[in-house]
């Protein structure tokens, strides 16, 4: 089997990670004690991707929980599925990172990282054929962003040929915990560009807007935001967990989705959107699902796809539906909106269908888009970064941990380069592709 080792780092990472395990355990018929009570062979066919089978037919998540303070992990442990995790896989410090990327990456986090890597090794050794790692973390804090990116680069060193996939929560001024979020996020993106194969950008701003506008929740809590994240993560990993036609393992997904190595930041989407506790009573049709799925209001990253163009798209439909109808609808979207798909990658939309719908829905659709409009998100963070960095505000917290201003300047320019790369491919057309490559050659010279 092709196993995936899951790592969750920091407060946000542990909260969305715990939620993810609740949702997929439920989908696979696994109760909080790790016993199977399902009703379909499909639930067990690829259970080994995310679970170890222990003695007594207990299924244990291949999950590693990491944090620099014990608080969040205590609440995971006492949460609904807290007892399903392997106790040795909780790795935590006592000091906390204080929302400081430098503490997570260079000082506090660096002290803890070896004990995390021991657990990673142990999990990887119990795998038959490890396909890769997935990390849930946020980019705004200290542990998930600083230590999360440190773990990525260490794991990259040790397992260079394995896929590294992250679910990264981007900070937003609308749901802000700290003033230094733009610093932490920029320093993290600097690492993610170089060291991951696939990054799902989950943006608090977009989640907030969905809760507020679409779900009509007046004061959305993190619980409501995490409900959306877990629905999306469940959808995105469907192809990895259930037998399907487009049997995406992480590597096949990367091959389909990433045309240029640096441009691996995906915009996830989900339809139909429902709030916690209220499920829709009307089954949606395939055309409605398709239409909703491509709508900017359903995107989990606060970017409007109409402001850019899609390099590649993957769509995952779940539930009993006609494959023919799905294919027709997907072609329909592409034909009607052809200007929003780059014409120099033909057939850049791939579709998978899985028979098992998520709990409480007859059918659902998950969207993964590699769109040049994601640059809006990086621009937003970059502007906030520059505003503070120009005045060297709050820098002493970072230099005090041994960082150099140079690193900030490098991270800033790497992020700006990323934005211009997206822009360059947005403007590229099929016929000028030749000239375009010559220019690239000159730049490098």
From Swiss-Prot:
- Where in this protein does the record say 5-glutamyl polyglutamate is found? 438
Keywords annotated in UniProt: Acetylation, Cytoplasm, Cytoskeleton, GTP-binding, Isopeptide bond, Magnesium, Metal-binding, Methylation, Microtubule, Neurogenesis, Nucleotide-binding, Phosphoprotein, Ubl conjugation
Q: Could you name the domain of life of the organism this protein comes from?
A: Eukaryota
The cross-references to SUPFAM superfamilies, in alphabetical order and at most eight, read:
Tubulin C-terminal domain-like, Tubulin nucleotide-binding domain-like
Question: In which broad location class does this protein mainly occur, judging by the first location in its UniProt entry?
Answer: cytoplasm
In this UniProt entry, the residues modified to N6-succinyllysine are 58
Named cofactor requirement(s): Mg(2+)
Motif: MREI motif; annotated at 1-4
Compositional bias, Acidic residues, is annotated for: 429-445
Modification N6-acetyllysine, positions: 58
Stored InterPro entries = Beta-tubulin_BS (IPR013838), Beta_tubulin (IPR002453), Tub_FtsZ_C (IPR008280), Tubulin (IPR000217), Tubulin/FtsZ-like_C (IPR037103), Tubulin/FtsZ_2-layer-sand-dom (IPR018316), Tubulin/FtsZ_GTPase_sf (IPR036525), Tubulin_C (IPR023123)
Task performed by this protein = Tubulin is the major constituent of microtubules, a cylinder consisting of laterally associated linear protofilaments composed of alpha- and beta-tubulin heterodimers. Microtubules grow by the addition of GTP-tubulin dimers to the microtubule end, where a stabilizing cap forms. Below the cap, tubulin dimers are in GDP-bound state, owing to GTPase activity of alpha-tubulin. Implicated in neuronal migration.
Q: Which family does it belong to?
A: Belongs to the tubulin family.
Domain characteristics, as noted in the entry: The MREI motif is common among all beta-tubulin isoforms and may be critical for tubulin autoregulation.
Output this protein's name.
Answer: Tubulin beta-2B chain
Organism in which the protein naturally occurs: Bos taurus (Bovine)
């Amino acid at each position: 089997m092709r196993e995936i080792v899951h790592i969750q780092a920091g407060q946000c990472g542990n909260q969305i990670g715990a939620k993810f395990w609740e949702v997929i355990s439920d989908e696979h018929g696994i109760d909080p004690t790790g016993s199977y009570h399902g009703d379909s062979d499909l639930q067990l066919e690829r259970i080994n991707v995310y679970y170890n089978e222990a003695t007594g037919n207990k299924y244990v998540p291949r999950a590693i929980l990491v944090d620099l303070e014990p608080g969040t992990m205590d609440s995971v442990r006492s949460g609904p599925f807290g007892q399903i995790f392997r106790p040795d896989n909780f790795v935590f410090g006592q000091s906390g990172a204080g929302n400081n990327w430098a503490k997570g990456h260079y000082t506090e986090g660096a002290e803890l990282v070896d004990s995390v890597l021991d657990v990673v090794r142990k999990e990887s050794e119990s795998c038959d054929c490890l396909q890769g790692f997935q990390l849930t973390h946020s980019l705004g804090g200290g542990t998930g962003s600083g230590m999360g990116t440190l773990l990525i680069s260490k794991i990259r060193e040790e397992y260079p040929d394995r896929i590294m996939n992250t679910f990264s929560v981007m900070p937003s001024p609308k749901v802000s915990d700290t003033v230094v979020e733009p610093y932490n996020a920029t320093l993290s993106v600097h690492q993610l560009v170089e060291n991951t194969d696939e990054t799902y950008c989950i943006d608090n701003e977009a989640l907030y807007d969905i809760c507020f506008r679409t779900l009509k929740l007046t004061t959305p809590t993190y619980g409501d935001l995490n409900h959306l994240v877990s629905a999306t993560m469940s959808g995105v990993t469907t192809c990895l967990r259930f037998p399907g036609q487009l049997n995406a393992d992480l590597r096949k997904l990367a091959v389909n989705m990433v045309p240029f190595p640096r441009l691996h930041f995906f915009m996830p989407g989900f339809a139909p959107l429902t709030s916690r506790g209220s499920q829709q009573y009307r089954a949606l049709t395939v055309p409605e699902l398709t239409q909703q799925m491509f709508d900017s209001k359903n995107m989990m990253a606060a970017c409007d796809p109409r402001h850019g163009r899609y390099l590649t798209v993957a769509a995952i439909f779940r539930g009993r539906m006609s494959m023919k109808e799905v294919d027709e609808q997907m072609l329909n979207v592409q034909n009607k909106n052809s200007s929003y798909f780059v014409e120099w990658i033909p057939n850049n939309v791939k579709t998978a269908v899985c028979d098992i719908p998520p709990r409480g829905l007859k059918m659902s659709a998950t969207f993964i888009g590699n769109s040049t409009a994601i640059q809006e998100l990086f621009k937003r963070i970059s502007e906030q970064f520059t505003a503070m960095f120009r005045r060297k505000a709050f820098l002493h917290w970072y230099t005090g941990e041994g960082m150099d201003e140079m690193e900030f300047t490098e991270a800033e320019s790497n992020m700006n380069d990323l934005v211009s790369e997206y822009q360059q491919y947005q403007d590229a057309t099929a016929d000028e592709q030749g000239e375009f490559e010559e220019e690239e050659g000159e730049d490098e010279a």
